[in-house]
Regions:
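Extracytoplasmic/secreted envelope proteins and their assembly/folding machinery
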Residues: 1, 5, 42-45, 49, ...
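Conserved SGNH/GDSL esterase-like catalytic core that processes O-acyl groups on lipids
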Residues: 1-46, 68-73, 128
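Arginine residue identity/basic-tract feature
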Residues: 3-6, 15, 55-58, 77, ...
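Loop/turn elements at helix/coil->beta-strand transitions in domains of secreted/extracellular proteins
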Residues: 12-17, 53-60, 92-96
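Catalytic His-Asp segment of secreted/periplasmic serine-dependent ester chemistry enzymes
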Residues: 27-29, 64-148
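C-terminal structural cap/anchor segments
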Residues: 38-69, 73-81
Length: 148
């Protein structure tokens, strides 16, 4: 929230917003505070969309990618990710959703990346994909979302 004005709203000519945030927030929360974080993230995402749309921008939400295997993975944090992703997929605040989670997750172990996208650029962190994974994310974006 702190950088939203500078990084988004104050950019001249910006017409579109893709909100792809959250995994670092999730990793930093205690399991006890995870339910509160879900609410806080959804409130922030709602503010982002409303503010951007009030400025005439189109706003798209992007699901949070898996982080199973990372040192800060817990089932409580995974519940936050799944709850936020479900909200993105079903909300009516955004103009659309870009499902990065579906594009890169393993079809059997839904908490992890597909094996083809690992190791990532930061070796074994289970957060950063390799180039094939980032290409899958790019391919998940429907470019028709950006036609006037």
């Amino acid at each position: 929230m702190n950088r939203f004005d500078r990084d988004v709203l104050n950019q001249s000519g910006a017409r579109y917003l893709i909100v792809f945030e959250g995994v670092n927030d999730i990793g930093g929360v205690s399991d006890a505070n995870a339910p509160t974080l879900t609410t806080n993230l959804i409130n922030a995402y709602t503010t982002f969309a409303g503010t951007a749309k009030a400025r005439g921008m189109r706003a798209y939400g992007a699901t949070i990618t898996p982080f199973g295997g990372n040192g800060y993975y817990t089932s409580a944090r995974e519940t936050v990710r799944q709850s936020v992703n479900n909200w993105f997929r079903t909300n009516t605040i955004y103009d659309g959703v870009i499902d990065f989670d579906a594009a890169v997750r393993d079809p059997v172990t839904l908490t992890n990346f597909q094996a083809a996208f690992f190791p990532g650029v930061n070796a074994n962190d289970w957060l950063h994909l390799n180039p094939a994974g980032y290409k899958a994310m790019a391919d998940a974006i429907d470019l028709n979302l950006f036609t006037p």
